[in-house]
Amino acid sequence: MSMFLDTAKISVQAGRGGDGMVAFRREKYVPNGGPWGGDGGKGGSVIFRVDEGLRTLMDFRYNRKFKAKSGEKGMTKGMHGRGAEDLIVFVPQGTTVRDAETGKVITDLVEHGQEVVIAKGGRGGRGNIRFATPRNPAPEIAENGEPGEERQLELELKILADVGLVGFPSVGKSTLLSVVSSAKPKIGAYHFTTIVPNLGMVRTKSGDSFAMADLPGLIEGASQGVGLGTQFLRHIERTRVILHVIDMSASEGRDPYEDYVSINNELETYNLRLMERPQIIVANKMDMPEAQDNLKAFKKKLATQYDEFNDLPMIFSISSLAHQGLENLLEATAELLAKTDEFLLYDESDLVDEEAYYGFAEAEKEFEITRDDDATWVLSGEKLERLFVMTNMERDESIMKFARQLRGMGVDEALRERGAKDGDLVRIGKFEFEFVD
């Protein structure tokens, strides 16, 4: 039996852009040929694609690092370097992707073939042909390729099911799924026979169909991690209707109504929104002695919790083993699904603003200035660091261009205001230089 894995932590790194080239045209009969260095190729992006054939995140158990290839360097004759191919990572339907550092949801992948760029490849550096001007017709300037984005991610699989079966262990959830669908869950006369979610397609006599999930049994304290805990509670979140299965024969010695209250408390504690989903109470094992008396007592206790303004949940008496009452239950479930919309899984505040992430923020902070214990001034900031890594420090003209960019950003003036003096050391990353006032 293959293992069921529904969470994973991975890292992804997009490819770096290829470096631009410094080259000059040198051909017979072409005097003053000018610059001829081409741009570097784009780095490969990391793209997640949904594959309906996958059922778990098992592929990520041992393969946790995904790195796309870098673009090729620019070439002479103004030719661009070859762009790297994107790295396609296949994930199962129902995979939620979060930023591990912020906890924000990046994307929710539910449709077969759906694709999302998770880490964007760096752009290629410009070759010297791009920097030619009337004042400098033969520039010895080329950019390094831009680094690709790097992210730490948390993947979470929540199976796609219209209906979820919940209840204590051994109340008959797996048996119910096995008789109303072609699913073959493991069934046994002991607790936690079901240790992974099972999914089956149900078709009613009237022709309606829906996906039903049998989830591992819950016990008191599950929302705090007791038993199988929250490990599988997450799979209920995508369901639109909950079938709350109760052993009305009380064969385990528990009170059916207390079971009902206890499970609902766990659902509410785990995620308050789960209680927004309509529930149908499935009174199972009604072919057993005392089940009828227990059902009467159950209904009496349940009625005390509702008033004239709140409708009692629907209750269906069934016996999965004897195949009794199943048709009415399934028809009612299909009718309830037809008038129940999808539920929002996340608040907007939980979602990453991808436009802002990919550089369309209204105000990007250009740089910050701090001072180390050794009195070195330290420059940081996304824009400044991006300019720095794309500067070819082996060429004087590139360094001079970077110095002009710093002045244009106001770095020199800001250093003076902070008290920097001629000859002070300034550091960007691992690169150090002297401040010249």
UniProtKB/Swiss-Prot annotation:
Its main location: cytoplasm. Residues 359-437 form the OCT domain. The lineage of its organism: Bacteria, Bacillati, Bacillota, Bacilli, Lactobacillales. Mg(2+) binds at residues 174, 194. Its cofactor is Mg(2+). InterPro entries: G_OBG, GTP-bd, GTP-bd_Obg/CgtA, GTP-bd_prot_GTP1/OBG_C_sf, GTP1-OBG_CS, GTP1_OBG_dom, GTP1_OBG_dom_sf, OBG_GTPase. This is GTPase Obg. GO terms for biological process: ribosome biogenesis.
